[in-house]
Amino acid sequence: MKKILIGLCLIPLFSIGQTTDEVLKELKKQDVKFPKIVLAQSILETGWYDCKDCSLDKNNLFGLWNSKKHEYFYYTNWKESIGGYKRGIQYRYLKKEYKDYYHFLSEIGYATDPHYIIKLKKIFNKL
């Protein structure tokens, strides 16, 4: 019953029109580097915030995986997942100089899909 209620609570929050603006605003508020690319990542990872079988039921916009527990990270709300992304992913960007953020994502192996960056750029160009 708990999972159903969580899913129902997410539906009104993640309506396509307002969500991208809200997520982008929060990315900037939390000082996430390359916020528009990261916004595109959240869209790609959640299927425009409409996935049925992904990490969205855990308020996880980025599909961040807990390798110790073999499950998606759970966040109390979607804004916390942005903080999780910043701490879990972007701290590595600051440790080394990269040509660009797409290169960084490829180098750290962010996604297993070999076409991830191409898909990400297509979404980015639609924003």
Regions found by a protein language model. Give the residues of each.
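Generic cytosolic/nucleocytoplasmic N-terminal low-complexity/intrinsically disordered segments
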Residues: M1-K2, Y91
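Catalytic cores of secreted/periplasmic lytic hydrolases that degrade extracellular macromolecules
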Residues: S15-L127
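Sec-dependent N-terminal signal peptides
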Residues: K3-S15
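Basic side chains
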Residues: K2-K3, K119
